[in-house]
Amino acid sequence: MEKMNWLSRLASRVPGHRVPQGASLQTPVMADPETCLMVFKNHWSQVVRILERQGPRAATGGADDLSAVRNHTYQMLTLLAEDRAVPSAPSGPGPLLEFALREDLLSRVLTWQLQWDEFGDGVEERRAEQLKLFEMLVSEARQPLLRHGPVREALLALLDACGRPVPSSPALDEGLVLLLSQLCVCVAREPSLLEFFLQPPPEPGAAPRLLLFSRLVPFVHREGTLGQQARDALLLLMALSDGSPTVGRYIADHSYFCPVLATGLSALYSSLPRKIEVPGDDWHCLRREDWIGVPALALFMSSLEFCNAVIQVAHPLVQKQLVDYIHNGFLVPVMGPALHKTSVEEMIASTAYLELFLRSISEPALLRTFLRFLLLHRHDTHTILDTLVARIGSNSRLCMVSLSLFRTLLNLSCEDVLLQLVLRYLVPCNHVMLSQKPAVRDVDLYGRAADKFLSLIPRCCRHHAPSPPRPEHASWARGPGSPSVDSSSVVTVPRPSTPSRLALFLRQQSLGGSESPGPVPRSPGLTASPTSSPSRRPSPAEEPGELEDNYLEYLREARRGVDRCVRACRTWSAPYDGERPPPEPNPLGSRTKKRSLLPEEDRDNVREGEEENLGSRGLAVGVGDTPGYLLPPQLNGVPGPWPEGAKKVRLVPRLVPQEGVRELLEGTSEDMAGLESFGQELQELEVALSNGGAGSEPPLEPPLPPEEEEAYESFTCPPEPPGPFLSSPLRTLHQLPSQPFTGPFMAVLFAKLENMLQNSVYVNFLLTGLVAQLACHPQPLLRSFLLNTNMVFQPSVKSLLQVLGSVKNKIESFAASQEDFPALLSKAKKYLIARGKLDWAEGPTAGPAPRRSDSLVRSRRPSLGELLLRHAHSPTRARQAVQVLQPGRDGTGLGLGGGSPGASTPVLLPRGGASERQGEALRVKNAVYCAVIFPEFLKELAAISQAHAVTSPFLLDTSEEVSLPPISGFGPLNP
């Protein structure tokens, strides 16, 4: 993840001593101190004769006087820069400096030169010369000049003169910023000097002045090295303000620093390209190499990086003010409308920008304000998060960018994000049958879930070669419910940042003459594949590495992912295990109430204090907080009632004591454990649903008022442009609002997952990666919802197992209708493997990459965005990859060539126009790719379910934590 490390780079940009630029200074010939002092006094005596005249133009040769003073001053300051303290008094000033302080040399010369500004001739040139001389003196001096008051007063007088209305020029701006930068470096070495530059108010009631700071602020958003120097200098002052309450209060209360930063971000964002030139079909996020060449975006990222660094080091008053200004001056008025543009290209660009910002920010306070904006800010009655969730069901490009954004959000491991997306709908436990609630916390110790997932691999996607006799090993694989997998081991070096489902395409296979991999450690009991059999090794023209025996790699990758989530979630406020936070007790059976028990006035209070509650425990209000409820944000501004997942779950006011509820639940689970009770409950539910939810018993709630029905309709079908957005509703068709609902996020993910055959290969990679990312979380509610294949859900709740089963049936149906499906599948695997190997290649070099150690290869392997989800920029690489599997340019068919460009197996397509043939070719290509990805996704889910069984948040090895990359997780968002 790209993180901002401004401070680590700052030292290299601010050296201790600098060679002055452009002054044409000659290295003085050092003489003895007495001679230097004599020469210094001689120059000063000649200057004094000119200064003691009545005015700048009293003599006829006024211009000559100005030139003479400039030359003598240059000689004196050159000598003064080389002056050193005498050995007898090492802490005192040197002889030249002592003489200059006694005569107040700097102030007298500067005052005389500033008198020439009244005539308006050559002011810019003189000011630039003055700045250059003082900068040379400050940077080259061998004594701490700033400790002496006369030197500081002269510098402040010069900085004050720079605030007068003088025509600006590049030389003048460069000289001013350079001098200020050198002063900041000196002050950073001696922080006690900072408050000496803070001038008292010129008159009662006025604000104090810190010219060292205020003169830098106008350059904070400047381009090029000038702006970079100004930001570096300001950052040094920000770091010093943390230890100086006086300076911190000045910056927060008497300067425009924070408003300038926030409004500058808004102005810079308005100059960003509204349409991103997409480099390829697999593009889904902005990497550094994408935006570094765009000047407007590079300048914005530099300013955002600076804001991140300021919040990291500045005084708490400055931090809070800057965060508030960014939220209210940039996110709400600029990012909010930008994310809701009507043009699809603009929506793609704004979503990609937002994902880049979230991925680049490293300071928690700034990250929190971005998340607060996403979770709580409403635009046209919808939260930003609701809008982004809906876009997952849109066209391919907008869907990919949205999936990439949610991948970044989940990587933050923020409790409030997951609570808002999924957990608040699962906390009431209405998605499971009442008798199944105790099973939420069950751990699958025998691999039954893994066995179930692996059994969903379509038969047409399995390797059917005969296997050698299975060795008799005493291992877990021989136990009941253990997975048995046809597989063939493939060598790779696992990498935590690479999703394991991509390991299929990133192996070093025996393609194109590459060396054969060594044996891979095999778990006892896993079926040996024909590929690893000594009696038979397939040729490269056969199955590409067989890709069947990579389950051990998935297990390693899953263990890393689960451990990472466990460590990142340790600071969360609740384990979300079905008891904490406690679901609302319901004495009426499995048909729970769908309305909040809050009175209307309490709902209004909750709505008013919604954003403030985010500071204490995010969206989850603790027991000690006033309302005492788990507060999901309102939907479309309507406080309720909503589906069960969106209702408010009581934490403090309870109908039954907590101990009684636990006994009631335990007793209920025991009474309902029998098959009769369970079957009777299912029958009752079936009868109730067949009658439209109405039975002989009175309804549990009155019907929704018309205005609330309208609000609910507006939520389920948001008033956005229909084309690029929802291809499937957030709720299934004919689903009643009173039925259990697992949330729009899971609904749109499952709907997209169910249409895997229609998705592009890149959408499926991002989609399956997002689901696997969710499955790695250790919260029992989420883990059981996704991975517990024995859990019985409510009839209206679709499980992941059902979705995967539907995809399996579609793949098998497609394979049965496609005569050459095995050949298509083999070609698709070869293409994806070749694509992965090309993206791992060493950049633009034409020759083969030299062999290197595994550790070096592991250290440079790119991330997800740089692997398969990455366009092959090099024409050579693109040509190599396109030979394997690409749709025909003329629309005549789907080219499925093997290794040579001319060898292809055309797919027989129906007669019709070119557009119909191209559409059919695209449909076949997407379905074949899906048949490759789907089995690997099932292996990944199976491995994750087994990793959960052996991972405990209390038993993690600390040594393992040290060896793995650091994880930054967020609990509830704090102010």
UniProtKB/Swiss-Prot annotation:
The modification Phosphoserine is found at S467, S510, S523, S529, S533, S863, S900. It holds the Pfam family DUF5917. The modification Phosphothreonine is found at T892. Keywords: Phosphoprotein, Protein transport, Transport. Residues 482-496, 527-538 have a biased composition (Low complexity). GO terms for cellular component: FHF complex. The keyword Nucleotide-binding does not apply. Residues 465-496, 511-548, 573-621, 690-717 are annotated as: Disordered. One of its GO terms (biological process) is endosome to lysosome transport. Residues 597-608 have a biased composition (Basic and acidic residues). Component of the FTS/Hook/FHIP complex (FHF complex). The FHF complex may function to promote vesicle trafficking and/or fusion via the homotypic vesicular protein sorting complex (the HOPS complex). FHF complex promotes the distribution of AP-4 complex to the perinuclear area of the cell. Belongs to the FHIP family. Component of the FTS/Hook/FHIP complex (FHF complex), composed of AKTIP/FTS, FHIP1B, and one or more members of the Hook family of proteins HOOK1, HOOK2, and HOOK3. The FHF complex associates with the homotypic vesicular sorting complex (the HOPS complex). This is FHF complex subunit HOOK-interacting protein 1B. It comes from Mus musculus (Mouse).
